[in-house]
Design a protein with these regions (language model features):
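Terminal alpha-helical segments
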Residues: 1-146
Length: 146
């Protein structure tokens, strides 16, 4: 009986160790994406990052959902990110809001990585410039787009 109990406790400890490792990996990816998003939005607001021109069609941009577009146009805002498989990336896309024609709006999408490429965290910020006012809205992308 003690052997069975010991084996069960051992299996439970292994499961807990794996879960802790997965949580650590997800946190690593989240912090990488959050850092990239902060750096890219700050650079966009300061004017030190290239801001694409407004698109012809209305609606929120969807280039970040396409692997080819994201990989080709994303920038890497840091030189190194310890503990991540790849450096975090961000993509800035212009956004035309029909209800606010005087506003210049952008969607900034950031992707951070954990210890391996499969662990990713995606975050977005919507930045709207209208006159001297800057609006910032943050959101987490729940499902990986690709």
């Amino acid at each position: 009986m003690m052997l069975v109990t010991s084996a069960a406790w051992f299996e439970a400890s292994l499961l807990e160790a794996r879960n802790a490792s997965l949580i650590t990996d997800r946190l690593q990816a989240f912090h990488a994406a959050d850092g990239a998003l902060s750096l890219c939005t700050r650079a966009l607001v300061n004017g030190s990052m290239f801001a694409p021109s407004a698109p012809l069609q209305p609606g929120e941009p969807a280039g970040w959902r396409q692997k080819g577009t994201f990989e080709a146009q994303a920038v890497v805002p840091v030189v190194t990110w310890p503990g991540s498989a790849r450096l975090p990336q961000c993509l800035v896309e212009a956004w035309r809001i029909d209800s606010r024609p005087a506003a210049r709006a952008f969607v900034v999408t950031a992707r951070g990585f954990g210890v391996d490429d499969d662990t990713q965290s995606w975050l977005q910020a919507q930045i709207v410039f209208e006159g001297t006012r800057v609006e910032r809205h943050w959101r987490r992308v729940v499902a990986r787009p690709f």
